[in-house]
Swiss-Prot record:
Disulfide bonds join 78-189, 206-214. Gene3D superfamilies: 1.20.1250.10. The gene is GH1. GO terms for cellular component: extracellular space. Belongs to the somatotropin/prolactin family. This is Somatotropin. InterPro entries: 4_helix_cytokine-like_core (IPR009079), Somatotropin (IPR034975), Somatotropin/Prolactin (IPR001400), Somatotropin_CS (IPR018116). PROSITE patterns: SOMATOTROPIN_1 (PS00266), SOMATOTROPIN_2 (PS00338). Keywords: Disulfide bond, Hormone, Metal-binding, Phosphoprotein, Secreted, Signal, Zinc. Plays an important role in growth control. Its major role in stimulating body growth is to stimulate the liver and other tissues to secrete IGF1. It stimulates both the differentiation and proliferation of myoblasts. It also stimulates amino acid uptake and protein synthesis in muscle and other tissues. Pfam families: Hormone_1 (PF00103). Zn(2+) binds at residues 45, 198. GO terms for molecular function: growth factor activity; growth hormone receptor binding; hormone activity; metal ion binding. It comes from Delphinus delphis (Short-beaked common dolphin).
């Protein structure tokens, strides 16, 4: 029987539906392990959504013979690469949890503006059928990261520092080649940045709570 995978899926769905920690002094407070579990699940969900959308956009609009060259142009440059954030798991393991949370927060906040235009670009997308909710999902993950920061710092919430330079808005004029290239580059950066945030959160969760699933 497939009771194992089904149980795991139901547990993951239940965790995604859980609220974040209560206000200070409220009861009951969510354990730190649950905060990390929720954040990792949300980051994984967003990263997969971004990856699926990138692939769908690529299949629909970018000729296969042009994909490699386009990916190596300035259109594929992500300005988040200019911040001193770890580029992979090994580098992330050299940073403190608080540093990784701050980098994760910066990455998430840099997309809060641009993703509000996704629903206009992908109105007929099967993968992004709920694109108007991506902003809500990002805000939810932002809230979870801030809850973790409150727990790991001094217990008092800090105002999240939004990157001074955020990504451009997605272009809704899908008949323009320039708009297609711009959106293709943005989707590539969105996927890369969410992968970074997911990696940071998984590294933190694994080194705090020893698990058999830490290999990734």
């Amino acid at each position: 029987m497939a009771a194992g995978p089904r149980t795991s899926m139901l547990l993951a769905f239940a965790l995604l539906c859980l609220p974040w920690t209560q206000e200070v002094g409220a009861f009951p407070a969510m354990p730190l392990s649950s905060l990390f579990a929720n954040a990792v699940l949300r980051a994984q969900h967003l990263h997969q959504l971004a990856a699926d959308t990138y692939k769908e956009f690529e299949r629909a609009y970018i000729p296969e013979g042009q994909r490699y060259s386009i990916q190596n142009t300035q259109a594929a440059f992500c300005f988040s690469e200019t911040i001193p954030a770890p580029t992979g798991k090994d580098e992330a393991q050299q940073r403190s949890d608080v540093e990784l949370l701050r980098f994760s927060l910066l990455l998430i906040q840099s997309w809060l503006g641009p993703v509000q235009f996704l629903s206009r670009v992908f109105t007929n997308s099967l993968v992004f059928g709920t694109s108007d909710r991506v902003y809500e999902k990002l805000k939810d993950l932002e809230e979870g990261i801030q809850a973790l920061m409150r727990e790991l710092e001094d217990g008092s919430p800090r105002a999240g520092q939004i990157l001074k330079q955020t990504y451009d808005k997605f272009d809704t004029n899908m008949r323009s080649d320039d708009a297609l290239l711009k959106n293709y580059g943005l989707l590539s950066c969105f996927k890369k940045d969410l992968h970074k945030a997911e990696t940071y959160l998984r590294v933190m969760k694994c080194r705090r709570f020893v698990e058999s699933s830490c290999a990734f």
